[in-house]
Regions:
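Oxidoreductase cofactor-interface core, primarily capturing Rossmann-like NAD(P)-dependent enzymes
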Residues: 3-11, 26, 37-160, 176
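Aromatic/hydrophobic pocket-lining residues that form the small-molecule binding cavity
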Residues: 12, 16, 201
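Short, amphipathic alpha-helical "lid/cap" segments that border enzyme active or binding sites
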Residues: 17-20, 111-119, 217-225
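Short acidic/polar active-site loop segments enriched in Thr and Asp
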Residues: 29-30
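Terminal hydrophobic/aromatic helix or amphipathic segment near a protein terminus
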Residues: 134, 148-198
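Amphipathic terminal alpha-helices
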Residues: 207-229
Length: 229
């Protein structure tokens, strides 16, 4: 993993490069890479492997070895518990207060919407998306404070959001919740990215593709209600 500041090509991107090298060896001429909807550069550790992979692909493109398309997939609606203080117990959670290390607006996007748009891109006429880097995120945004409100509504019980510093966040989830420190420290950097607005995406690509198919993006409100039903 990327924990403990893995050196280049020793983190998750090691596997990305192996797949890319195998594709080139097999004679593949075009690679579509599904990246993640943080910025580049980013403060989020989770984005490091993607940034390294994106750079490698762009270098290969410049060398004329392959053409590329980079899709920065939006942060999943369905992943909100990870950002909301590891709220994986969902209906069984008893916490009245959830600690996070920062807040910011996020263009949460459902997996089915992204899957549909990605499939349309993959099946598009040859050359339509070559050389492009873009996001697949809906334009509406929600904060973690909004999520606290939605969870409270779904559970008919007030759940408060408490924003603390990264050190307090890390110590709490390691000491009180028994999580592994390298993992928590790695993940806590994501909140710096949220605070900087990295995940508030203004890219019309997803909504344009959905609109052409007579669809609208699924709301985070609906996803939370379904997951807590």
């Amino acid at each position: 993993m990327d924990y403990n500041n893995a050196s280049p090509w020793q983190g998750r991107e090691k596997h990305h490069r192996a797949a890319i090298d195998a594709a080139l060896k097999a004679g593949v001429k075009h690679i579509v890479y599904t990246s993640l909807a943080f910025a580049n550069p980013s403060k989020a550790g989770v984005m490091t492997a993607h940034i390294r992979t994106e750079k490698h692909l762009k270098d290969l493109e410049k060398e004329g070895k392959v053409s590329i398309t980079i899709i920065r997939e939006g942060l999943y609606n369905e992943s909100w518990p990870l950002y909301f203080g590891y709220y994986f117990g969902l209906k069984e959670e008893t916490r009245k207060e959830v600690l996070v290390a920062g807040d910011g607006r996020v263009s949460w996007t459902s997996i089915p919407d992204m899957a549909f748009a990605t499939a349309k891109i993959l099946s598009a006429r040859e050359g339509e998306w070559i050389g492009k880097t873009f996001y697949l995120s809906q334009k509406k945004t929600w904060s973690l404070e909004d999520i606290a409100r939605l969870v409270s509504k779904a559970k008919d019980n007030e759940i408060k959001l408490k924003v603390v510093g990264r050190k307090e966040y890390e110590d709490f989830y390691v000491t009180e919740k028994g999580m592994e420190r390298p993992s928590v420290e790695w993940w806590s950097s994501s909140y710096d990215a949220l605070k900087d607005g990295e995940c508030a995406i203004d890219d019309p690509t997803l909504e344009t593709i959905l609109k052409e198919a007579g669809r609208k993006p699924k709301s985070l409100d609906d996803t939370i209600m379904e997951m807590l039903r």
